[in-house]
Amino acid sequence: MSGYEKPSRGWGFCALSPVLLSLLMAAPLGLLGEETRQVSLKVISNRLDFSQNLLHIRAVGTNSTLHYVWSSLGPPAVLLVATNTPNSTLSVNWSLLLSSDPDGGLMVLPEESIQFSSALVFTRLFEFDSTNMSDAASRPLGKSYPPYSLANFSWNNITDSLDPATLSATFRGHPIRDPTGAFTNGSLAFRVQAFSTSGRPAQPPRLLHSADTCQLEVALVGASPRGNRSLFGLEVATLGQGPGCPSMQEQHSIDDEYTPAVFQLDQLLWGSLPSGFMQWRPVAFSQKRGSRDSAMPCQSSPLHPTLAYLLPQSPIVRAFFKTQDHSCAFNLTFGASTGPGYWDQHYLSWSVLLGVGTPPVDALSPLVLGIMAVALGAPALMLLAGGLFLLLGRKRDSEYQSIN
């Protein structure tokens, strides 16, 4: 059974790094960025089993189209594909996609219009005790519990959560086998939201988005931890562009208006031009209404090459890329042994932007500009006032005439 989709209408100032500048200069004009895009969300279901479905986000610009294909077949995964035509489409052949050899089961057509493509796969959810933890991102020293393989989760029908008004949908899942009952009242959710123009969400971390991006919020809610002060982590796999792994960068600023006390922005950049990217603040939250009081550090390990067959396989990644010779992975760890944690309210959320082209760059906020103006302007005004006072004083002395 096959489905074929026709075109539808529908934190602070950071200087540009040499890498970003080269991306800006070298990317084709059609993919340098669109101020607005016509965005559509469509659920593509297997007619033989409606519980098997894909979420296709199609963002059409003047001379380009961005395709985000989200899937819960196997581990949660997303394909990022950018084309240089506003008429590219997604083709899905369910019979091939679900077979042992899924080559050609998922394609973006015409294939020659593809300018960039890669994928992210969320493979495992880690849990470990935070006791005596020194470097959670690379080697947790506390007790490590058996990880949850996200390929062995059961997920909701994405159609039930599709919201065209907010251009969002949510994959919500729990382990198929849960002998400890940890997820009896809990779930792991992946909320996806697309954008037709630039802006900033109302809730922290308030990542600046553009029409070339979509946002993913990962939330662990209500699951019973296996330790008194458990920390959780997420394993993320991606495809390298060539023999190496994508690059990881840190941007720093003096502005924390949108995410208080967080002065860093982390980025993952793929190497091809135009590049795809991930962008996130190194912060997670232990309450649904994120605030400074519920902020937890988010640590990321370095990207390292890995063999694809050692990771849970995503059918859509296998179908689109055929061979996966250059896989890389890294871990994200949320929280620390002290401070806010998942144990507060059995809640954890983390947000990331995915996109193609040049990552959004924050300008200094009006508040910071005002503070800088006052800080720099006050001394100048004092000097000016002092100079005027001296001049007026000298003038008065020169006008004085002795009565003698």
From Swiss-Prot:
Gene Ontology cellular component terms for the protein in this record: cytosol; lysosomal membrane; lysosome; membrane; nucleus
Quaternary structure (record): Interacts (via lumenal domain) with lysosomal protein MFSD1; the interaction starts while both proteins are still in the endoplasmic reticulum and is required for stabilization of MFSD1 in lysosomes but has no direct effect on its targeting to lysosomes or transporter activity.
Topology in the lipid bilayer: Single-pass type I membrane protein
Biological-process GO terms, alphabetical: positive regulation of transcription by RNA polymerase II; protein localization to lysosome; protein stabilization
Biological role stated in the UniProt entry: Required to protect lysosomal transporter MFSD1 from lysosomal proteolysis and for MFSD1 lysosomal localization.
Main location: membrane
Signal peptide: 1-26
Places the protein is found: Lysosome membrane
Glycosylation sites: N63, N132, N157, N185, N228
UniProt similarity note: Belongs to the GLMP family.
InterPro entries membership: NCU-G1
Motif (Lysosomal targeting motif): 400-404
Cytoplasmic side: 392-404
Keywords: Glycoprotein, Lysosome, Membrane, Signal, Transmembrane, Transmembrane helix
PTM entry text: Highly N-glycosylated. N-glycosylation is essential for GLMP stability and for MFSD1 lysosomal localization.
Organism listed in the record: Bos taurus (Bovine)
Transmembrane residue ranges: 371-391
Source superkingdom: Eukaryota
UniProt name for this protein: Glycosylated lysosomal membrane protein
